[in-house]
From Swiss-Prot:
Binds 1 zinc ion. This is Transcriptional repressor NrdR 1. Negatively regulates transcription of bacterial ribonucleotide reductase nrd genes and operons by binding to NrdR-boxes. It comes from the Bacteria. It comes from Paramagnetospirillum magneticum (strain ATCC 700264 / AMB-1) (Magnetospirillum magneticum).
Length: 153
């Protein structure tokens, strides 16, 4: 693998270990040219998923986009990065298990919301406010009312 610091073509793997959920391998690498060290992550990719957006356009599934949206929703909440990685790995596996090459963005949003509602209601509300495009305080109130009614069932 090419060194991200100096561009040298051949780096050495110093340490490899699976992540806690065994969904990927973390490798610690060293560059013999500049002596820099860096970490890489290796995952199995069954197929390239294409996301169909609301406007009909298509783009390659961007796992980091899901990670960032969860980090924003879970900011200052008692959830660490490893838990976020496990959530995203689970969502990605569910999408791949559908057997489809194309998935609607709405499905990804719903999967994220399904995880968040059982995990952290504040994060669920934060995510929903962006995902459902809340424009005013009334939208929050309406949504909280629906959450309360669902909890009563």
């Amino acid at each position: 693998m090419r060194c991200p610091f100096c561009g040298h073509d051949d780096t050495q793997v110093k340490d490899s270990r699976p992540t806690d959920d065994n969904a990927s391998i973390r490798r610690r690498r060293a560059c013999p040219a500049c002596a820099s060290r860096f970490t890489t992550s290796e995952r199995v990719q069954i197929r390239d998923l294409v996301v169909i957006k609301k406007d009909g356009s298509r783009s390659t599934f961007d796992r980091d986009k899901v990670v960032k949206s969860l980090q924003i929703a879970l900011r200052k909440r008692p959830v660490d990065e490893e838990q976020i990685e496990r959530i995203v790995n689970g969502i990605h596996r569910r999408l791949e298990s559908l057997g489809e090459n194309e998935v609607p963005s709405k499905l990804i949003g719903e999967l994220v919301m399904d995880v968040l509602i059982g995990m952290d209601q504040v994060a669920y509300l934060r995510y929903a406010s962006v995902y459902r495009n809340f424009r005013e305080a009334k939208d929050f109130g309406d949504f909280l009312g629906k959450m309360g009614r669902q909890g009563d069932d």
